């Protein structure tokens, strides 16, 4: 049996963890909204048309913030279309996903849904095809108390109190040629700066997220972030990162090593932010918003054919990845990587939340169930609050097709305000269990509380509506601090010690 060791000291920390690290994302795309979170004709719909079964699952994830309404969708979106009486809202073509948007679920509905889901709104504005005044007006509509045309219109539309939305995305993936109104870095940086400036003039308490490059494969990656920040540094608070991984070639070892790339991606963008900080002689630190991250590849070929040949419609089956057990391991490894970079990654949005590359799936007029990736996200959101500890990992290493010196075991650790310690660990070895020796220093008396394990002998095992519990955590005995414990082969582990 392989051996590994994890050394932790309560005085060696990375950073307090921003609670928004465990956010998610709802876009007007596919069935995320219509027949996802919103289905008025469903037998479990509430008085506003929100599916209660979906709300129950979302609450279990305990997501603190949900990004909305896009995504690529937002670059052609007119926010005013989504307010007022539903029967008067216009139907529009959504060029991003070649669908028809009825706007029967809009801004007020999402704010109400977020309250019922015990989450907050992270609202994205359109900087592709709209202008700076629109940015001002939507903040005024949402956050200004009363006494202006836009704030009084919100009141007329049924919301006396301001929505008080604190987090705002300045567009989406504006370097991408697929984006409606794509920009050069200079064009976008200037526009983002002016938009953020007037938005903060309306409400000085808000924070803004500038678009980073759409990915490391973009030809302007790095130079994009630098130029955008040179133009907008003083008025933005975060830079966005988007990252998806897949296993199209069925190389599980290489797939599970993908977080080596994620760690480098995070550190590269953080270094660019700090370089601009130095150039500008600024005392302000711009941090990171990893506001799209997940596994995404299962549905891509199907979606390509559907997108090319389908008629215009609403609530089409787009990006409906069915996740398997190895995908859950990778999601767990991504969460571990985010926790170990908690000093710079302050916001995270698992993309997305329902039906569209999502931990939660629904059937129209049918059931709702948790996909495999639901469980690592739920575990991290439940137990990963507090302070990220600096781990010393001693484990064997291996090479894969694209990565070298990949640790056989990866881990992150969190200490909450009560002094309880939670360890998240993944055994990357596909066939052999691993003994983990825990050396917990200066924590005082701790007693074993839980060892939860997500494991399946079949890496391709899936959860479905008819069999929703194929991949589900089990509880194993948790040894005392200092005693070794066993990580099953290919497993996600949550190990807790409490005061």
Question: Where are these predicted regions, by residue range?
Answer:
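Active-site His/acidic residue clusters
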Residues: 242-257
């Amino acid at each position: 049996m392989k051996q590994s060791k994890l050394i932790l000291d309560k005085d060696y920390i990375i950073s307090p963890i921003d609670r928004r690290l465990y956010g998610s994302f709802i876009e007007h795309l596919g069935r995320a909204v219509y027949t996802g979170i919103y289905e008025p004709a469903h037998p479990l719909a509430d008085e506003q048309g929100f599916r209660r079964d979906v709300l129950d699952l979302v609450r279990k994830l305990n997501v603190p913030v949900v990004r909305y309404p896009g995504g690529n969708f937002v670059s052609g979106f007119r926010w005013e279309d989504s307010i007022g009486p539903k029967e008067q809202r216009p139907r529009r073509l959504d060029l991003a996903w070649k669908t028809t948007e009825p706007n029967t679920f809009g801004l007020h509905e999402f704010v109400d849904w977020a309250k019922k889901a015990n989450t907050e709104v992270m609202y994205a504005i359109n900087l592709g095809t709209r202008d700076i005044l629109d940015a001002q007006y939507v903040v005024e509509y949402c956050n200004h108390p009363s006494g202006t045309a836009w704030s009084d219109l919100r009141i007329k539309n049924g919301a006396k109190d301001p929505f008080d939305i604190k987090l705002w995305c300045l567009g989406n993936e504006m370097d991408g040629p697929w984006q409606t109104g794509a920009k050069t870095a200079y064009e976008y940086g200037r526009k983002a700066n002016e938009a953020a400036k007037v938005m903060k003039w309306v409400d000085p308490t808000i924070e803004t997220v500038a678009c980073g490059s759409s990915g490391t494969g973009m030809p302007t990656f790095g130079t994009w972030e630098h130029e955008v920040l040179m133009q907008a540094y003083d008025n933005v608070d975060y830079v966005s990162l988007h990252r998806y991984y897949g296993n199209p070639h069925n190389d599980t070892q290489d797939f599970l090593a993908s977080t080596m790339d994620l760690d480098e991606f995070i550190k590269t963008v953080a270094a660019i932010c700090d370089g601009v900080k130095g150039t500008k002689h600024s005392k302000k630190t711009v941090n990171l918003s990893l506001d799209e991250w997940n596994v995404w590849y299962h549905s891509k070929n199907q979606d390509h054919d559907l997108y090319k040949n389908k008629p215009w419609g609403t609530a089409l089956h787009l990006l409906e990845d069915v996740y398997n057990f190895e995908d859950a391991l990778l999601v767990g490894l991504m969460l571990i990587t985010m926790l170990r970079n908690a000093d710079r990654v302050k916001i995270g949005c698992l993309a997305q939340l329902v039906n569209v590359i999502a931990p939660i799936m629904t059937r129209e007029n049918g059931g709702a169930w948790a996909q495999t990736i639901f469980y690592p996200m739920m575990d991290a959101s439940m137990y990963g609050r507090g302070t990220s500890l600096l781990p010393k990992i001693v484990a064997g290493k291996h090479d894969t097709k694209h990565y070298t010196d990949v640790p056989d075991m990866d881990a992150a650790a969190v200490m909450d305000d009560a002094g309880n310690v939670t360890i998240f660990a993944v055994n990357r070895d596909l066939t052999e269990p691993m003994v983990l020796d825990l050396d917990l220093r200066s924590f005082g008396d701790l007693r074993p509380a839980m060892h939860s394990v997500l494991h399946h002998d079949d890496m391709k095992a899936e959860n479905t509506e008819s069999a929703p519990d194929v991949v589900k955590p089990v509880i194993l005995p948790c040894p005392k601090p200092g005693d070794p414990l066993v990580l099953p082969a290919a497993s996600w582990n949550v190990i807790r010690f409490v005061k």
